[in-house]
């Protein structure tokens, strides 16, 4: 009888121990999955942003346009303040504008308020890849670096969306650091993949 009691007790301890191990293993797997998912989101978006920067640097606009959101397209903003009424550009329209050398209206110049009417290539050179952002001095994910004198409404315009920023600080002593410049990409998930929905240039304006 005593032997039977000891055997039952040992079996209970064994089962309980195994259950604790199984529960701990499940918790560990859940925690690891959450960490992996968080890292994967950041890494995948940063990889897409880098692909966009490389495409802009080498002027491969087919690749750049392939990153546009398939149905929403991309909104281009020449300054930190995003005009939510400004139309979005689909990839096919962006490429057609390059091929046909069309002049597009991209927004308005800060200060004068005059319409920014430019062909795609000159706009890219002035308001998108105006610096070597692929090798930017500072980079960030979901955080702002450059802060100018215009309202930055990115988070209000694109709540809960991820973005990257590439920033060069000012170098001309004459301007006391105000000649900084930055580029931001905003991404949105579509069919389990991330695509670009906004390209925002920012700088200090007079």
Model regions and ranges:
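Positively charged n-region of N-terminal signal peptides that target proteins for export
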Residues: 1-4
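Hydrophobic alpha-helical targeting segments used for export or membrane insertion
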Residues: 9-11
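C-terminal motif of bacterial Sec signal peptides marking the signal peptidase cleavage site
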Residues: 13-16
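Long, low-complexity intrinsically disordered regions enriched in Ser/Thr, Asp/Glu, Pro/Gly
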Residues: 18-19, 206
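Short, low-complexity N-terminal intrinsically disordered segments enriched in polar/charged residues
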Residues: 21-54, 58, 66, 70, ...
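Surface-exposed acidic loop/strand-edge motifs in secreted or periplasmic proteins
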Residues: 65-145
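Short beta-strand edge/turn micro-motifs at domain boundaries
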Residues: 126, 131-206
């Amino acid at each position: 009888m005593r032997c039977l009691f000891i055997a039952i007790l040992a079996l209970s301890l064994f089962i309980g121990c195994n259950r604790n191990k199984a529960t701990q293993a499940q918790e560990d797997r859940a925690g690891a999955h959450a960490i992996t998912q968080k890292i994967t989101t950041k890494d995948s978006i940063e990889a897409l942003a880098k692909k966009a920067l490389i495409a802009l640097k080498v002027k491969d606009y087919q690749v750049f346009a392939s990153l546009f959101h398939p149905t929403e397209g991309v909104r281009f903003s020449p300054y930190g303040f995003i005009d939510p009424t400004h139309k979005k550009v689909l990839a096919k329209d962006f490429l057609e504008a390059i091929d046909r050398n069309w002049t597009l209206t991209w927004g308005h110049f800060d200060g004068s308020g005059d319409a920014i009417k430019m062909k795609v290539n000159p706009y890219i050179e002035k308001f998108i890849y105006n610096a070597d952002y692929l090798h930017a001095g500072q980079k960030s994910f979901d955080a702002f670096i450059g802060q100018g004198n215009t309202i930055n409404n990115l988070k209000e315009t694109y709540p809960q969306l991820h973005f990257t920023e590439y920033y060069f600080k000012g170098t001309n002593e004459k301007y006391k650091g105000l000649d900084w410049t930055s580029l931001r990409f905003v991404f949105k998930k579509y069919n389990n993949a991330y695509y670009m929905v906004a390209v925002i240039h920012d700088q200090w304006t007079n």
